[in-house]
Amino acid sequence: MKQALRVAFGFLILWASVLHAEVRIVIDSGVDSGRPIGVVPFQWAGPGAAPEDIGGIVAADLRNSGKFNPLDRARLPQQPGSAQEVQPAAWSALGIDAVVVGQVTPNPDGSYNVAYQLVDTGGAPGTVLAQNSYKVNKQWLRYAGHTASDEVFEKLTGIKGAFRTRIAYVVQTNGGQFPYELRVSDYDGYNQFVVHRSPQPLMSPAWSPDGSKLAYVTFESGRSALVIQTLANGAVRQVASFPRHNGAPAFSPDGSKLAFALSKTGSLNLYVMDLASGQIRQVTDGRSNNTEPTWFPDSQNLAFTSDLAGRPQVYKVNINGGAPQRITWEGSQNQDADVSSDGKFMVMVSSNGGQQHIAKQDLATGGVQVLSSTFLDETPSLAPNGTMVIYSSSQGMGSVLNLVSTDGRFKARLPATDGQVKFPAWSPYL
């Protein structure tokens, strides 16, 4: 069915400045154990070269999820331009039971039609499992590709795709009047733009659940402060600027509250603000340091880092009262957790034997799986569908962003060319 593509991010582009030095995915290890799939280069119906490699975008998205292993283009048994041209036997002979084909057609008004078809080459050979078409302007061709990826991914896995999401992160550039920048890009590093520039450090961006705002820490006043910035117009609301430390903001899933850490009474403790009234209440107390809150789906419970037992570990607490419960037991220390949107697992920074990596813990069984193999890994953030994690790690004298699938199959880097990159935060569905 033909439909016009709705541009979800148009309001951002009105005021944001697009950058040339972008972060882009560089593959570290592949997905040989993922489900084989064929993604054919989309047929271009215009003059010259196609303005965007839509088929390449779809293949990369499916690969990045860790759940698929797209066949290399050099090994494609054929390059059909339509569903009718797919020869199922040629694909099934290679163990491939689904193929994505597509078409890109220029329109007289300067726009483009992008269409795809997902074709069964296994159980019901030749059957079109999913198809769609979109009319977009040139700058939204990548978005059209991500849209096709989302639909193919959901059809084949039953999981909502997260390829049209974005990431926020902080870049410390190499000098200049404003060396600290809060940036946002597509999840794969493309279409990057600046949200805020500062002469002083910026830290810990966090998305509102509707994707319209970012909370973050700034030191522009001479001390730490928590602010919330509206992306559409740049308006900034100061949330907290108490003596000592103000940090680690986290919006509740229902959007009504903001959790954060303050040290105004000495030790770091967790607080929750009702965003409508501005009222703040303290959640933890005592001499231990409690920080890095992340919400459970019910918007009533927090996972957080505490040194209550000596070394940092992850605990759970209800914001309405009750004693914190420790939920991490493997490794010498665990911290900076991010709970999945379904509440079934969390990712965290786990240290053991002198190594600091990103790990995944099943919250029902307590089972832990180490996902990363990079150096000094920090600040993991989950995609809204729980299939991928973005995090930062040390590389040489700087820091870079890394992507790993939550099954550990796929690992990649998103290196920046103009500074150190830290504090990644994955957006909700947009």
Swiss-Prot record:
SUPFAM superfamilies in the record: TolB, N-terminal domain, Tricorn protease N-terminal domain
Presence of keyword Signal: yes
Keyword DNA repair: no
InterPro entries: 6-blade_b-propeller_TolB-like, PD40, Tol-Pal_TolB, TolB_N
A GO BP annotation: cell division
Extent of the signal sequence: 1-21
Superkingdom of origin: Bacteria
Similarity field: Belongs to the TolB family.
Protein name: Tol-Pal system protein TolB
Species whose genome carries this gene: Shigella flexneri serotype 5b (strain 8401)
Gene designation per UniProt: tolB
